[in-house]
Amino acid sequence: MRHYMWNRLSALCLALCLLAAGLPLTAFAASPSPVYESTILFTHDTHDHFLPMPDEEGGEYGGYTRLATLLKQEREAHPDALTLDAGDFSMGSLFQTIYATHAPELQALGAMGYDVTTLGNHEFDYRAQGLADMLNAAVDSGSPLPAIVQANYKPPESDTASLEAWERYGIQDYVILERGGISYGIFGLMGEEADSNAPMSGMEFEPTVEAAQRTVAAIQAELEQSSNPSLIICLSHSGTDGKGKGEDYELAKAVDGIDLIISGHTHTVLEEPIQVGNTLIVSAGEYTSYLGSLTLSWSEDGQKTIQDYRLIPVDETVAADPGMEQLTNRFQPLVESEYLAQYGLKFDQVLATTQFAFTPISQFATEQREDTLGNLIADSYIYAVQQAEGDDYVPVDFAVVASGVIRGSFAAGEITTSDAFNVSSLGSGADG
């Protein structure tokens, strides 16, 4: 069994002790120089956020256009960095309306240089056929695309359309990559709760622990053929609560050999990596709010150390990347012509204004109480029924909105078509 020393915390404690004792920091710094260094850049739960979102202070955050700039900057500093994503890259903005026909999400990840991603539950919001169509559209685009890994969530033998699309794209349980003298085994998992949140996916679910044990063993057998130092990374769409509970904590406890879990699905922000045995767990929040960066080093005696861990804000201080802006501008007219035109709407058309900001999505549903945005959406359901039934309208007694389907909010000022769509932007359910 490989034993690694994740000693950032102990190093910090030692440094503080040396300072308290009046000893020079050079005594602490006299450790073996790193022989190898590995940087992993990561995201998850980006949910189609090509464009920035309004923040609580009236500014903006996130967006692929700014994320692309940060990725380029980080790769300039770390040329051998891997760029990984832990799923739910779709469903969250108007760009999802061309998901099955143009695959803008995978084209965007490819344009930003992502090496590998996995599938989250929202990749199945348009069901198995929607995903199959998206995979085929991505391949047909001829654009650079990330590898997709998925070890425990697959089409049944009867779903030939999905099987053919998955094979055509090249979805595998895992991939082996070599970068900067280091070998990486990277695999993907769908969590149990995430599976339950995709009831219409039509996929076959293998328990995560069983799938991980099987896949890690296969990766280890391949990595043993190389003399390179290695890392086994799990792109897990399972999640944690950030406080010691969650499926990814249990995964780390149950499966030996996973060095790093990039934990998606729960939209958790982990300010520091969580260590469970010899496994690190990291998370970078939702909607491209942050770009995660983890740097590890190996010393001559084989010790592995956390050199750096950052959650880099994707905020207004980051300039938009011209190439990603160009790609976004190419997709926006397709959204208008293929989806919005039937409603007589434009992407940035102003529909209304509000003098106050609604509850920020980061604070929404944190406690059980009435909410203005929820009331507005519930009222819109009743209005839609009135419009549909006309003279035959039967009064509705009440309307209910599940908090989980509310995905955005309104800042003070103008409300555009795009803003309105983002608020309730998930795909189809059992009712169509």
Label the model's feature ranges.
Residues 2-13:
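Bacterial N-terminal signal peptides that target proteins for export
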Residues 3, 30-36, 346-347, 394:
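Extreme N-terminus of proteins, especially the signal/transit-peptide cleavage junction
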Residues 8-9, 129, 426:
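Short linear sequence elements within intrinsically disordered, low-complexity coil regions
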Residues 12-24:
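Bacterial N-terminal signal peptides
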Residues 17, 44, 118, 367-370:
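A generic, residue-level signal for flexible/boundary positions that often mark functional hotspots
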Residues 30-317, 376-380:
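Acidic, metal/ion-coordinating pockets
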Residues 47-49, 91-95, 109, 228, ...:
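Solvent-exposed loop/linker segments at secondary-structure transitions
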